[in-house]
Structures are given as C-alpha cells and as structure tokens.
Amino acid sequence: IEFPAAPRGGAAVIDCDQIPELAARERISCVIVAERDSQRRTEVAAALLDCRLRGLRVVDAVDFYEKLSGKIWLEGLHPQWLVYTDGFDRSRLTVCAKRSLDLLFAALLLLLTSPVLAIVAAAIRLDSGGPVLFRQVRVGQHGKPFVLYKFRSMRQDAEAETGPVWAGEHDSRVTTVGKILRKFRLDEIPQAFNVLRGDMSFVGPRPERPYFVQMLRPRIPFYDLRHCVKPGITGWAQIEYPYGASIEDAYEKLQYDLYYAKHMSLRCDAVILLRTLGIVLFGRGR
C-alpha cells in the first residue's frame, strides 16, 4: 500500500511502514487520515500506532474537515466513522425537551401571528385567486411521508406542464404576493401546524419531496441519514448555504444537515433560531 504525504510543502508517496520514520525526520506533529477503504485504513492505523504512542496526533480527515467548516465531509465519509464518532446522540431528555419547546413555540407563533395570517390569506386570494394554502407530500423522519402546509406563493398548477422541479431563487412561477411572503418567510408559518402534529420540528433538515428523494438517494452517498431526525422549518443548511436548486446544491446541503444531525441539541437549535430570526426581521436571504 502507498501513502501520500506532504513534507516541507512538497509531496511524497511512501509505504505505510515508512510513516514513523517520515514523521520523526520531518518533525510532523499531526497526521490526518483520509482513507475510506476499511482494509487500507487498518494498514495505515497499524503503521500509525507507533507514532501515536510517541505523542503524534492522529486525526480522521472527516473530523478535521468538520471542525474547520461546520459540515460533514461527504467525500471522505465512511461507515466506521459514523459508528465510532461522538455525536448523533438521542437522549430521551433532549428529545422530550425539544418536543415540549416545539409545542410551546408553535402555539405562540400561531397565536401571535393570527392577525397576519388573515391578511396574508386575503392578499393571496386577491392577487391570484385559488386556494390560500399549499399542500404537498414530503419525506419526514425515518422516511415517513407527511403532508406539509405552506401559504401558496406560486401560481396554481405551477408544475402541470413541467412535472416536479426545484424552486429557484428567482422562480418565474412565484406570484407578486408570493415574492413578499418568501422574502420574509411568511409562507412558512402554516408549518407550525405540522410542528403541532409532530411531523416536523422548528429546527431540522428541510423536508424534501419523495420524487427528489428517490432521485438523490442513488446519486448522493449517505443521503438517507438526513432522515434520522425530524425535518424542520429552518435548519443549519438554510442559514449556512444559499438557495439551492440542483443535485450539487443538495450534496452541499446534506453536509450541513449531517452536521446538525450529529450535534442536535437545544443550544444548537437556539443558535439556528436566533440567526433565522435575524434573516426574517431584516428580509435577508431567499
């Protein structure tokens, strides 16, 4: 087996058993292991054992990337890392506390925005006629489908001729009122009903449509892992990544979704909600 290294800013290809010698000669203090193949990882680990016992830091590339970027490196992700890494904890206390806060905030949101809801409903009817609410099947936790509610921001039968397509940042199907609703995230308020029903949480990966889940699953590794937590009205990917409407964007967003799934906590939710509130109040973003 060969092992790439970069002493003194250059590049070298060495055998695994040469790693300790190279580390000592070049005074290397940390080795980052970026190897997905389980057999090769075992051989590299055996060679690094001597280095580790001498005080050399050995770091998995996925962990290194995560700390630098705030997302999980999909290209380097491997099953062993998922099994042995810290995080992805689902303590009963955290789940119960998160659910209790979801119920409280959803009820408060609907109560406090009730005058706004009536105005929005009237504006939609006057602008484009048709139904006020938009209903669509999405994929929830553990792959369970549910009906998501939003204020309708597009014209009726927007996909009648095209079939399922991703919504774009400057989507021509969006109505005049819909543009305002999207800018201030007002179209998302009815999802508080989804939160009350238990289909969603306030914070989590955005739920995707079954059509796109089926399309992305074979194209993006570990895609189904995003379904290990409840989907959310807002999420880590939504505040860290711009509006996306492609497979490449879905790939990038999944890295943020997995980061959230790993670090899900009340503190993490609070940070995301506060940043989302800033976006809503100042109309930044989508």
Kindly give the residue locations of the regions a language model identified.
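N-terminal hydrophobic signal-anchor/signal peptide
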Residues: I1-S114
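Short, glycine-rich, amphipathic interfacial segments at transmembrane boundaries or analogous
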Residues: F3-R8, Y65-E66, K71-E75, F134-T176, ...
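Residue-level signature of the cytosolic catalytic core of signaling kinases
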Residues: D15, D89, L93, E169-H170, ...
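Short, solvent-exposed positions on alpha-helices
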Residues: T42, V59, D187-P190, C268
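Phosphate/oxyanion-binding loops and surfaces in catalytic or ligand/nucleic-acid-binding neighborhoods
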Residues: D50-R54, A107, L126-G129, M154-D157, ...
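A hydrophobic, helix-centered structural microdomain
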Residues: L93-A158, N194, L266-R286
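A short, structured surface patch at a secondary-structure boundary
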Residues: A167-K230, I272-V280
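C-terminal terminal-structure detector
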Residues: Y211, I220-R286
